[in-house]
Amino acid sequence: ADVFYIGGTKVGALFGEAVVFTKHNTPKHFLTLIKQHGALLAKGFVLGAQFDALFTDNLYFKIARNANEAADRIREALRAKGYTLTFEAPTNQIFVTMDQPTIDRLEREVKLGFTEKADDTHTVMRICTSWATTPEEVDQLIELL
């Protein structure tokens, strides 16, 4: 990819995302454009300090491992139980198509994120894991599925 972003909250950062340009292809006046459109936080160096620490000694990857492994377990369970994954995402985010009765039943116990209506009777929902997701929480969700 020419550009992508790295989320911080999945690994415990207070807030923020890092935009990464991979081929020395940062658009001309990129920082100025961000400032002019209100997308640059005051005291943004605090955000940078988090990522500086997270990118040292592979800390980001070490912390993210839990979120990604938890998401992988949930993806496997969804497939095994016949759910349709909307697309494959090798991250801590899972996008799954569900009917409304299933969503209603699950939302009595867990928080799902609405993504979009797939059709008249199905909705694409988002399930996220994080550095703090426990194996017990994953087991509970799998049982609910």
List the model feature ranges, each with a label:
Residues 72, 77-145:
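Conserved C-terminal alpha-helix-loop-beta "cap" of PLP-dependent enzymes
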